């Protein structure tokens, strides 16, 4: 066989159909017509002389041959992208793309600052930030879809041997209260006082929720006795709920700097209890590491990796920047997303 029986465009179409589950949605995602997608698949099947999809059901299902081609096709597309990016790097950071992955908290509150600093130094390098769950982010690194990532959760066990995993920083979780709550007048909250609070939490399967339960359990605090007022799916929603007086919550200190400065949330330590988790920097050591990724990891990341990076936020509470609404009005706030 002198010529390849497929093109890169056909591999992209095959991958899109597998991801989207239908020819129409695949066509929409690729900004082409559905007939064009169908024609390319027909040509591909004719060239290979084998069906790639089982068209009997409502969802486009890959045949065994389709799965095999997709497996190799994804590797081919990934290598093509690596090749293009390696050539771009020859321009000495005068172009190219840096793709950074992050779990929810780090992607929302930490990475934007880092990327801002990087863009100031290398304005010609495009930066993409992909924020997903810890598991999905780790797989994105393993598959070569992102250059590096900072995550705060548990890395899937099946990936620990294939990734370069570096302890990056400690993320401290703090108890936040509405500024008009009686406990805000206390220097510290006793363990037994936690059972008197109503809590706003992430769902029970979230990484942060599990860390909180584990640490408090080691401090002989039974979170099963907590009064859960509601479960929400984002840190921003939790902060807004606490600010509105609906309950208390545990959140990363990196997520509350703005609110502490503005005096719309209160942070009080728990006597004898510190809740911390490790943030991990992960690479794929078997993938080409771009000059942009090297510059980001060597020049930007160290500035945020100091052991006490959370303490700068906690000092805001110690400086009495939080104002009780009984004494002063709360300033207007806006959602920073």
Curated annotation (Swiss-Prot):
The keyword Transcription regulation belongs to this UniProt entry's keyword annotation: yes
> What molecular function terms (GO) are annotated for this protein?
DNA-binding transcription factor activity; transcription cis-regulatory region binding
Q: Where is the HTH lysR-type domain?
A: 6-63
What Gene3D superfamilies would the database entry show?
A: 3.40.190.290, Winged helix-like DNA-binding domain superfamily/Winged helix DNA-binding domain
Please provide the record's keywords in A-Z order.
Answer: DNA-binding, Transcription, Transcription regulation
Residue ranges flagged as DNA-binding region: 23-42
PROSITE patterns the UniProt entry points to = HTH_LYSR (PS50931)
* Family to which this protein belongs: Belongs to the LysR transcriptional regulatory family.
UniProt function note: Trans-acting transcriptional regulator of RuBisCO genes (rbcL and rbcS) expression.
- Protein's name in the database: Probable RuBisCO transcriptional regulator
Q: Which lineage?
A: Bacteria, Bacillati, Cyanobacteriota, Cyanophyceae, Nostocales
């Amino acid at each position: 066989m002198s010529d390849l029986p497929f093109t890169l465009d056909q591999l992209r179409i095959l991958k899109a159909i597998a991801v989207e589950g239908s020819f129409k949605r695949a066509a929409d995602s690729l900004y082409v017509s559905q007939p064009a997608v169908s024609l390319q698949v027909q040509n591909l099947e004719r060239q290979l002389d084998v069906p790639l999809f089982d068209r009997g059901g409502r969802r486009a299902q890959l045949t065994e041959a389709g799965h095999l081609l997709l497996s190799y096709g994804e590797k081919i597309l990934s290598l093509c992208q690596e090749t293009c990016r390696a050539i771009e790097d020859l321009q000495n950071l005068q172009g190219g793309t840096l793709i950074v992955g992050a779990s929810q908290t780090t992607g929302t509150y930490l990475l934007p600052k880092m990327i801002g600093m990087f863009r100031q130094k290398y304005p010609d390098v495009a930066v993409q930030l992909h924020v997903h769950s810890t598991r999905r982010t780790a797989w994105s690194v393993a598959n070569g879809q992102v250059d590096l990532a900072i995550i705060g959760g548990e890395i899937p066990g099946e990936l620990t041997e294939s990734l370069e995993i570096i302890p990056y920083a400690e993320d401290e979780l703090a108890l936040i209260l509405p500024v008009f709550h009686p406990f805000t007048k206390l220097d510290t909250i006793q363990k037994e006082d936690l059972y008197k609070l109503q809590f706003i939490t992430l769902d029970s399967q979230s990484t942060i929720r599990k860390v909180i339960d584990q640490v408090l359990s080691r401090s002989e605090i039974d979170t099963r006795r907590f009064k859960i007022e509601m479960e929400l799916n984002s840190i921003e929603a939790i902060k807004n709920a606490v600010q509105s007086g609906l309950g208390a919550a545990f959140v990363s200190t990196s997520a509350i700097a703005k609110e502490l400065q503005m005096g719309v949330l209160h942070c009080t330590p728990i006597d004898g209890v510190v809740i911390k988790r490790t943030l991990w920097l992960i690479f794929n050591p078997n993938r080409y590491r771009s000059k942009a990724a090297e510059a980001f990891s060597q020049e930007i990341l160290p500035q945020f990796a100091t052991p006490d990076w959370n303490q700068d936020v906690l000092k805001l509470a110690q400086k009495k920047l939080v104002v009780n609404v009984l004494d002063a009005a709360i300033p207007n706030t806006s959602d920073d997303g």
